Regions:
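Histidine-acidic metal/acid-base catalytic patches
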Residues: 1-35, 68, 96, 165, ...
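Conserved long hydrophobic alpha-helices within structured protein cores
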Residues: 1-7, 29-39, 145-159
């Protein structure tokens, strides 16, 4: 199990107009000690992520070459996302051009797993049949494309409120039961689950039980904390996710992927001169999380008692 982070840990600046270039971010993330990165292709609409350029393949070759040079593997990526089942979505035109590029780009960098969001069909009945059917039809061509480029797709758990058209009861695949059911319907080897611990915390899910149910379906993670109210994307132990209880289950189920931070809000509002020091702190917290995940932490003490 490697310690990884989304490239967005060193990306946006407080004005959300300025940014650090991806190649620079990768060098800095390696310098503070991360083992691997998640290429955040969901930033494809931003000027620092040049997937929309005419020469995007040349740029992606630079990214892949730097990954090799730094010995910083790109062990997962995150495709652009929107609710693909929402009729007449204004985002569809751009993102449906970018998603195939994201898959090909991931193949160029030998990325094993591409994370994608499922969609929710508007006004779906409580049996979720239409959402499931349409997600199957949506993902199947992308799974075939990913297979051609040597990649798999890890479908991510959602949380209520992620769609402007909500079905009764919330958003599809906001529970591990729905997600496992969808993944099992494909009957192909290059599909799995990305478990977002922060999303699950918003849903109040028993994450220990959820991980056990997912088992070998689990291929990737998004590690972030929150208070249970908003999807804050902050450093673990700054919210109320019970990491000490949850993470040891990863070794119990034989999880073979990485612990991957998605905590851009821990750095995005900081002045430039504090970003690297904060990223280094995140790396230290990540090492402790790895110890928890490998069930190496026992009989902790917490300072002095009165």
């Amino acid at each position: 199990m490697k310690l990884s982070t989304s490239t967005n840990l060193i990306a946006f600046r407080p004005d959300y107009v300025s940014y650090f270039p991806i190649l620079d971010s990768m060098k800095r993330l390696k310098a503070v000690g991360f083992d691997a990165v998640d290429l955040n292709v969901s930033d494809a609409g931003q000027p620092f992520f040049r997937l929309g350029d005419d020469n995007w393949k040349e740029w992606m070759q630079e990214v892949a070459a730097l990954s090799q040079e730094l010995s910083l593997p790109i062990t997962q990526s995150h495709a652009p996302f929107y609710n693909a089942l929402e009729p007449e979505s204004k985002k569809a035109s751009l993102w449906e051009q970018m998603i195939p590029r994201a898959i090909e780009a991931s193949g160029m960098a030998k990325v094993p797993w591409i994370v994608m969001h499922p969609g929710t069909y508007p006004d779906d009945a409580p049996d979720f049949r239409e959402s499931k059917r349409r997600n199957y039809e949506y993902f199947m061509p992308y799974l075939e494309l990913a297979d051609r480029f040597g990649c798999g797709i890890a479908i991510e758990n959602m949380a209520d409120g992620f769609s402007t058209h909500r079905r009764p009861g919330g958003v599809y695949c906001s529970t591990h039961v729905e997600l496992c059911d969808l993944v099992d319907s494909f009957h192909v080897s290059n599909v799995g689950i990305c478990w977002d611990f922060g999303h699950a915390n918003l849903m109040g899910i028993d994450q220990r039980e959820a991980l056990r149910v997912m088992g070998k379906r689990l291929k990737a993670t998004h590690v972030a904390d929150n208070s249970g109210k908003l999807d804050d994307h902050i450093l673990p132990f700054q919210g109320n996710v019970n990491w000490r209880s949850i993470l040891p289950v990863l070794s119990e189920i034989g999880y073979e992927g990485d612990l991957t931070f998605e905590i851009h809000n821990s750095t995005s509002r900081l002045p430039d001169h504090l970003v690297d020091a904060t990223a280094a702190l995140c790396e230290q917290v990540g090492r402790y999380l790895l110890d928890l995940a490998n069930d190496k932490v026992h009989n902790e003490t917490y300072g002095h008692t009165c």
